[in-house]
Amino acid sequence: MFNPFSSTKRLLGTGALLAAGWWTFLAPLETDSANPVNETENGSFDHKSELLDNANHFRLWARQTLAHYTSSPTPFGENEQKNFRPALRIGTLHVNDLNLPKFQKEKVLFLMREFGRQCDLIALQGMEPNQQEVLVEWIAELAQQNMDYGYLAGPNVGRAGQQRQFAFIYNKSKLETDRTQLYTLKDPQDLILFDPLVAWFRVRGIDPSRAFTFTLVNMELSDPAFGKEQNLLEEIVQSIRNDGRREDDIILAGSFECAVQNIPLCNDGWLGVLGDMPTDPSFQKRRDNILIQSRTTEEFLGKGEVFDFLRAYNLTVQEAIQISQHLPAWGEFSALEGGFQ
């Protein structure tokens, strides 16, 4: 016999499950803009902000877990889509002692070409001073695959005998930038070995008022055993927030040389899009990450991956280290401001 109440319960149950799934995996992350620092105007603790933070962390964990178990483990292949992606893929790549002769080695060239074409924007670390020829050659390699990329290169940074040059490459059909807004963070007290490189980007191809705009910071920190550069990240972020552009979406990409839970900034609402994934060829160390502020950068889609080029190219750990002591990695973001696709 038909029971209308039983049918109604099933419908309500299905609706509740669908709503919970949408909230967990699809809805933009929530933020309490009235009290952005977990404190009310009278100084008392804001439990609403605490609940929002906990909810956001749960949803990001759920999205990362889903992405991990549903993404293809197959290395980047020839059949992967090369056209405009609705999502923006931001990567970080550290190639030790990178210069033109090293870039031209077959396996290094293949890694940078393959990883380059799979990302819309890459923060590059490890390049030796005055090596813009590497960037020109890299762009030319991508152009042979009908991909239009540009680059931004910073000045040499570091101390005598220990210098680097940071750079970005970006998909010009997907992103625009303002070269006048490219700058190296000033460090008059010489507290950090390699001064971070800061750039501004906006997604192209959609209404500029709806396009995701953000600041990307390229950085390479020293091992915590030899310094306390990780403790400077909050001050670095604050300096960038006050640079006159009023950009709320700040993304830090590069080498942090420690697990995300050991980065003080990540105890204050920031998170690493790679979670606790190892990022060295031996899969023992947490060296690299992409950090975002979970309460302001709602555009993060909950997906971050490390490119295991050892498996992709059938290399030993020692062979891989000759290419890089770091594994490339990326995170995916919505192309639209606020995370709506």
Where is each model-derived feature located?
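Metal-dependent phosphoester-hydrolase catalytic domains
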Residues: 2-74, 240-248, 258-341
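Structured beta-strand-rich core segments of catalytic domains in phosphoester-bond hydrolases
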Residues: 70, 130-208
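Beta-strand-turn-beta hairpins that frame and shape the catalytic cleft
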Residues: 81-90, 173-176, 191-219, 338-340
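Acidic/histidine-rich helix-loop elements
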Residues: 87, 92-106
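Active-site beta-strand/loop signature of hydrolases that rely on acidic residues for catalysis
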Residues: 90-95, 112-136, 169, 216, ...
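Solvent-exposed loop/turn segments at secondary-structure junctions
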Residues: 95-100, 127-132, 156-161, 173-176, ...
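Active-site neighborhood of phospho(di)ester-bond hydrolases with catalytic His/Asp-centered motifs
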Residues: 123-125, 152-155, 251-255, 272-276, ...
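Extracytoplasmic, non-cytosolic globular domains
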Residues: 199-277
